[in-house]
């Protein structure tokens, strides 16, 4: 009998060594969550690299979205696919009750740029798209943070819901706006998000609202030399519109940005073109001012059509609000980012970074990837569809050094880093910072109340959401027809 008991005791001791504690028993603290995520790094890297290889464009991210959805399902999340009328959008939830903390995840790639995982310019033959904005890392880190937060909820028995939003087509497709319009954020208490970058930063700030549209002019074709009087040039309509819009630049607020590209203008000089089109972006820090300036650009198009004997059709392609900052939430994100720390390179990564740095201009120096940038107001001049989310619920943001310092977004240098271990290290920093922040939000109802009050004060009591893109359906084929 004693021998039998001794054998059983030895077996129990061996089991405790091989399987010391279930995952939930290790994730009651932030340190435990950090160790949990460190232990998942190899697997998370595989997920991110698979999405990097797929490089699926906006609204076409079928495999990338499914990969993340299945990952979340495997960890006990319930997943609703095809939300907001978008096949590649989904919402994954774990837990019950409030607070509801959302985490945004993106996974669309960019067209027209690709690069191998090497520190010199080397496009991949036969590939015409790539993750030049790091969304392969974005979606993966956000899913990892959501899973880590779910492990904390399980381990502590706390009430609350962690929700992952799978958000497609950020790059010009305004995917999140349709999700906002569908009411998917109406009950969310706080949302967290991040973005790949060349630095670690969680400063408060905002960016620009944007409204974009395609202007399609139609005229009458004729021989440009033999019968010019019979023609009505659609290209003249475009050029007249562009001229008037360029005059308009003197009479708009200082912070306004207007850009355009002629996407069709005829095929031969001796044929008066009966079709031409021009693609416009209008930006300003204030969403309503953006709307007003856009209407003036439309008036220029209508005047151009009238003056050139052509017609014009306007298709709104996208639109998003500027980001509404909540400083108390940003301070919380910042403190957690500081607690996690920056990105440290090993020797191989340092050699990679040295070679990449030789191809870059001015910018942050090597070594800054290990630091956290100071907490200070930042005005950005790009736009993102997460702006609309930030007007529905408080949104905390951060960026991490997934790229070599000095790297800009939408470059081959970004694609290269997004596909190797430097990107993965920055991704893990982001996952930890968001998981830590989610834990704080679940744990501290007073902080949540403070954040909510600041959000309501900044938004104002008379706010009514009116999406800049109007009531149009999601342009699921916008990448297939060259939009964005």
Q: Which residues are covered by each model-predicted region?
A:
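N-terminal secretory signal peptides that target proteins for export/translocation
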Residues: 1-5
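Bacterial N-terminal signal peptides
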Residues: 8-21
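Metal-dependent amide/peptide-bond hydrolase catalytic core
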Residues: 26, 239-484
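Acidic/His- and Gly-rich active-site-bordering loop/insert found
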Residues: 27-131, 136, 140-161
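Divalent metal-coordination and catalytic microenvironments
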Residues: 51, 92, 103, 135, ...
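Acidic-glycine-rich active-site phosphate/pyrophosphate-binding loop
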Residues: 108-122, 206-216, 403-411
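Glycine/charged-rich beta-loop-alpha catalytic/anionic-binding loops adjacent to active sites
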Residues: 118-132, 218-222, 370-373, 411-420
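Histidine/acidic-residue-rich, glycine-tolerant segments that coordinate divalent metal ions
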Residues: 121-130, 136-137, 153-273, 283
């Amino acid at each position: 009998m004693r021998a039998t008991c001794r054998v059983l005791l030895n077996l129990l001791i061996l089991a405790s060594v091989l399987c010391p504690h279930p995952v939930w028993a290790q994730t009651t603290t932030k340190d435990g969550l950090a160790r949990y995520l460190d232990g998942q790094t190899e697997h998370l890297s595989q997920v991110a690299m698979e999405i990097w290889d797929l490089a699926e464009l906006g609204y076409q991210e079928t495999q990338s979205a499914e990969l993340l959805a299945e990952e979340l399902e495997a960890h006990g999340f319930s997943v609703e696919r095809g939300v907001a009328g978008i096949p590649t959008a989904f919402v994954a939830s774990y837990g019950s009750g409030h607070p509801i903390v959302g985490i945004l995840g993106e996974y669309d790639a960019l067209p027209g740029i690709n690069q191998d995982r090497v520190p010199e310019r080397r496009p991949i033959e036969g590939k015409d798209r790539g993750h030049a904005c790091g969304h392969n890392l974005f979606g993966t880190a956000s899913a990892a943070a959501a899973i880590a937060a779910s492990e904390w909820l399980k381990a502590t028995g706390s009430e609350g819901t962690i929700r992952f939003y799978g958000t497609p087509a950020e790059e010009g497709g305004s995917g999140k706006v349709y999700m906002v319009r569908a009411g998917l954020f109406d009950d969310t208490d706080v949302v967290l998000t991040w973005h790949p970058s060349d630095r670690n930063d969680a400063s408060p700030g905002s960016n620009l609202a944007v409204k974009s549209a395609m202007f399609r002019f139609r005229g009458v074709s004729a021989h440009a030399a033999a019968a010019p009087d019979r023609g009505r040039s659609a290209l003249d309509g475009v050029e007249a519109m562009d001229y008037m819009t360029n005059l308009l630049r003197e009479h708009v607020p200082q912070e306004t940005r207007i850009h355009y590209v002629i996407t069709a203008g005829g095929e031969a000089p001796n044929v008066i073109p009966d079709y031409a089109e021009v693609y416009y972006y209008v930006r300003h820090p204030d969403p309503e001012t953006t709307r007003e300036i856009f209407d003036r650009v439309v008036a220029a198009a209508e005047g151009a059509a009238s003056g050139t004997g052509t017609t014009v059709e306007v298709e709104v392609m996208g639109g998003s609000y500027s980001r509404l900052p909540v400083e108390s939430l940003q301070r919380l994100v910042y403190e957690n980012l500081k607690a996690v720390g920056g990105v440290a390179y090993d020797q191989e990564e340092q050699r990679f970074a040295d070679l990449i740095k030789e191809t870059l201009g001015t910018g942050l120096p090597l070594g800054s990837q290990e630091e956290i940038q100071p907490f200070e107001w930042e005005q950005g001049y790009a736009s993102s569809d997460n702006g609309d989310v930030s007007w529905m619920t408080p949104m905390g943001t951060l960026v991490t050094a997934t790229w070599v310092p000095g790297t800009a977004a939408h470059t081959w240098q970004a694609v290269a880093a997004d596909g190797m271990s430097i990107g993965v290290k920055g991704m893990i920093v982001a996952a930890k910072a968001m998981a830590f922040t989610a834990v704080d939000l679940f744990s501290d109802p007073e902080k949540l109340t403070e954040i909510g009050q600041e959000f309501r004060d900044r938004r104002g009591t008379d706010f009514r959401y009116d999406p800049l893109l109007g009531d149009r359906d999601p342009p699921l084929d916008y990448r297939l027809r060259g939009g964005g």
